[in-house]
Structure formats: C-alpha cells, structure tokens
A protein has these predicted regions:
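Short amphipathic alpha-helical segments and their helix-coil junctions
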Residues: 1-7, 111-121, 211-223, 275-281
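Histidine/acidic-rich helix-loop-helix segments that form or flank divalent-metal centers
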Residues: 94-102, 126-129, 182-251, 266
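Active-site lining segments that contact anionic ligands and/or coordinate catalytic metals
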Residues: 134-138, 143, 191, 231-239, ...
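Terminal helices and disordered tails flanking the catalytic cores of nucleotide-processing hydrolases
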Residues: 204, 244-337
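Glycine- and charge-enriched loop/helix tracts that form the active or gating conduit
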Residues: 1-139, 146-185, 288-302, 306-319, ...
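A short alpha-helix capping/helix-coil boundary motif
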Residues: 38, 48-52, 152-153, 243, ...
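Hydrophobic alpha-helix feature that most strongly marks membrane-spanning transmembrane helices
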Residues: 118, 122, 142, 147, ...
C-alpha cells in the first residue's frame, strides 16, 4: 500500500487517508510502503483534525472488513489509536491471570477476539442489512474489556481482579461511541452487550427466570418481530463464544446456554402476565418498592414454571405479603385466565 505521489502531500490534503491506508493494508494483507508508513506516523496525531463522523466510518469499516485484528493493531502501532480511542489503547500491558487468559494481556486478548470475528457468520435468521449486525458484534468485541484497565487490582495472594469491569466497560462504551457520533440506539445496544458479556459464564447456576429475561431482551436498533425476536441473545452468545475462544478456549458454558435457549418454546420469555398492577392496587398496595418487588416476584415464579394460573398467582401474592407481615387487604382469588 503506497500513497500516490508524495505521501506527505496526500495526507496533508486529507488526513483521513492515513486511516484508509491502514484499512486497505488490513483488508488485503498488504504491507505499507516505508515512505507511506513514515508519513502515517508523522500525521497520526493530526487525525484529530478530522470530523468524528468520518473517523467513525473508517473505524467501522476496519472492524467489519477482512482481518480486523490486523487493522486494529496497525492503529495501535501507528499511534492513531491513542488519539481516536485512547481507552482501547490503554489495554496494552494490563496483565491477566494466565489460567484463564494464557494468550496474554488485555490488548492481546482483544486482538485475538477480533481475529475470530471472521469465523462468526451473521445469524441466518437476520433480516435486513447484515452490515449493521456485523457492526454491533464487532464494536462489542472491540470494547468488551475496555473496562479492565480502570478496574484492575491485585489481591494479596497475587491474583489479578477486574471486578465489575463489564459495567465499567458499558459506561465507557457509551462515552466512546457517543464521541464517534454513533446513533443512540446503536450505542445502547453495544453498551448492553458489554454489560451482559459475563452473564453466560454463570449459565449452569442461572435460574430459568434470569435466562428468560435475558432471552427477552431486544436490540433497540432493530425491529423486534418474527425471527428477530431473539437477536439480542444470539448476538450475546456469539460475543460470549468469541470471548471464550480468545482466552482459555472452553465452550462448556456456551454449549449449555445454546442448548437451554434453543429448548425454550417461542414466547416462553414473555408470557402473558398472570396478575397486573391493578390487582395490587386492589389490595391497597401503594406504588413503590413493595409494589415493584411483588410484581417481579410473581413474574419470576411464572418464568421459573412455578406459577401458571391467575388463581395461583393471586395466592402467591397473598402469601408473599403475609410472609413479610405487610398489612394490606388480601386479594380475592379470581378465575383462572
């Protein structure tokens, strides 16, 4: 890959060309001509003069095109990443526990994860433009551990911890993607995926209600209808699988999660409510923490297949209140719905 004519002159005309040079190098696995590379290094800090929208488009094309890990690494080596995504650049040198991450530090793990993107085909049931789905997964992969550097700590026994790094990373992703002028719904979707990316690690202990709530989540940037209704959890599964393969390599949790999700009948994650807030108001339960907690308790029991009728739900609600010594008028059992 070489600039036409004088690379300094070409990059002076439009600094975005340094990102395009890196994208072409990654896409075709071509080396960058030494003179062009020197000019890229010279203009790296000037990339900040380019509008965030144009930078976003090039970064997105790097992540969704062939060999995204090569492109991401070139951004790091050139110094461009430190300008446009300093939060990601800080992953380098953040060591991890080798039993879970034999591949190395957080940066190395992220590059390995990005290299696996090409092995993750777009979900076959996806309707619409597949590039949008690719972008969601790609940005979630690129930023899924961005919260590790600020949460890194070492215990007295020498083990490294990154407590709540997924929540920290989700918040950071909002800042990063907002800065890059991504659409609001896209930002929310990527942030949610990052916040949830560790949840399937507990799939063997996960209650049915918790799993069904996860399955019931939707992508705000896509219509929630037909075969799209489980697109969020399908994307989360792909992120989880990539994360595992880029670290210790085990897929036991992924396989179990996939099997449990596939076994759910359509609509199991969002069954009709057995009772509503109106029923609780009839008990004189005021709107507030108790009201909200009781509705959730009934819904959890329903999702765990412990309740299936309105009569049972009313009895459950009455017992729940009695156990807590709450002095409300009890509901009168109604007919089964």
């Amino acid at each position: 890959v070489r600039a036409i004519g004088d690379p300094v002159a070409r990059f002076s005309e439009d600094r975005l060309r340094i990102l395009r040079a890196i994208r072409f190098s990654a896409r075709f696995s071509f080396p960058i001509e030494p003179g062009t590379w020197e000019a890229i290094l010279r203009f790296a800090t000037a990339i900040g003069d380019v509008s965030q929208e144009r930078i976003r488009e090039e970064l997105d094309r790097i992540l969704t095109g062939p060999h995204p890990a090569e492109g991401w690494n070139l951004l790091k080596r050139s110094g461009i990443l430190a300008v446009v995504l300093p939060e990601a650049e800080r992953m380098e040198g953040v060591e991890q526990n080798p039993e879970f991450h034999p591949e190395g530090d957080v940066w190395t793990h992220t590059l390995k994860a990005l290299s696996l993107l090409e092995e993750e085909p777009v979900v076959s049931t996806l309707e619409g433009d597949p590039s949008q789905a690719s972008s969601l997964l790609a940005w979630a992969v690129a930023l899924h551990d961005v919260g590790k550097p600020p949460t890194a700590a070492i215990r007295e026994d020498g083990r490294r911890t990154f407590y709540c790094h997924e929540q920290a990373g989700a918040r950071m992703a909002v800042v990063i993607l907002t800065r890059l002028r991504f659409p609001v719904h896209f930002i929310e979707d990527v942030s949610d995926l990052i916040a949830d990316h560790m949840r399937l690690a507990a799939i063997f202990q996960m209650k049915d209600s918790t799993l069904k709530r996860l399955v019931g989540k939707t992508l705000r940037s896509w219509p929630d209808s037909g075969p799209m209704s489980r697109y969020y959890v399908n994307t989360l599964l792909r992120l989880h699988r990539i994360d595992c393969l880029a670290s210790y390599g085990g897929l036991a949790e992924y396989d179990h999660a996939r099997a449990r999700i596939d076994a759910l009948v359509p609509g199991a994650e969002k069954p009709p409510r057995l009772i509503t807030g109106r029923d609780l108001l009839g008990m004189k339960v005021p709107r507030g923490p108790v009201y909200t907690e009781l509705l959730k308790a009934v819904e959890d029991a329903q999702l765990n297949d412990e309740l299936s009728t309105r009569t049972g739900a009313l009895a459950f609600a009455s017992a729940w209140l009695r156990e807590r010594n709450l002095d409300f008028t009890e509901l009168v059992d109604g007919d089964d719905a």
